[in-house]
């Protein structure tokens, strides 16, 4: 089993469905969560929504601006659409110095007005690699994770999430932190996939899952990797 860590987690872009779902799952798992947004009031409303969905008052979740959330956190999870990725990273660049940042960005065509089932090839290879390149001088260790987990499944907090979480990073500590966070979500198993270049493959799975949702009229298509040894 992965060692248990207690973390203060900033979910940047946490007012969208993916970010809200991750914030919800981390909070009910006992973590201290800060939802980040460009608008502090919007972030506070999202935090209140997490409390409402959870139906509990014993969880720790609050809202803040993106820079304030990132500054206060031990680990930062980025959950913004592709078109907002770089401007958001620029706004928190100083606040993520020497921290682990987990990027859940997926480059899909719907981010620029096209199809949600079409992947956009990026010059850097993947959205996570683009983030790592941008933050390299800050000493930020970037991991790719949560790209393939359905937002609607995350928000159905009474049900386990039937999906593995594929994790990639060039830094051992970032891999471990991302895997630890993933396995705080009921039903999720973290699969360490190696270096960050593997994010190119991980990110491309998401438009396929969206296509399967559409074709089969479901919402929560996920991925499971079989016949692997138990990870210690």
Swiss-Prot record:
Catalytic activity line of the entry: reduced coenzyme F420-(gamma-L-Glu)(n) + NADP(+) = oxidized coenzyme F420-(gamma-L-Glu)(n) + NADPH + 2 H(+)
GO cellular component, one term: plasma membrane
One GO-annotated biological process of the protein: copper ion import
InterPro entries named among the record's database cross-references: NAD(P)-bd_dom_sf, NpdG, P5C_Rdtase_cat_N, STEAP_metalloreductase
EC number: 1.5.1.40
Binding site for NADP(+): 15-18, 37-38, 42, 80, 106, 151
Keyword line: NADP, Oxidoreductase
TM regions (residue ranges): none
Temperature dependence (free text): Optimum temperature is 60 degrees Celsius. Is extremely thermostable. No detectable activity is lost when the enzyme is incubated at 65 degrees Celsius for 4 hours.
EC class (word): oxidoreductase
Highest taxon listed in the record's lineage: Archaea
Subunit: Homotetramer.
NCBIfam families xrefs: npdG
Summary of the function given for this chain in its UniProt record: Catalyzes the reduction of NADP(+) with F420H(2) via hydride transfer, and likely the reverse reaction, i.e. the reduction of F420 with NADPH. Probably functions in the regeneration of NADPH required in biosynthetic reactions. Is specific for reduced F420 as electron donor for the reduction of NADP; neither reduced FAD nor FMN can act as electron donor. The enzyme is also specific for NADP; NAD is not utilized as substrate.
Family: Belongs to the F420-dependent NADP reductase family.
Listed name of the protein: F420-dependent NADP reductase
Organism from which the protein derives: Methanothermobacter thermautotrophicus (strain ATCC 29096 / DSM 1053 / JCM 10044 / NBRC 100330 / Delta H) (Methanobacterium thermoautotrophicum)
Gene symbol of the encoding locus: fno
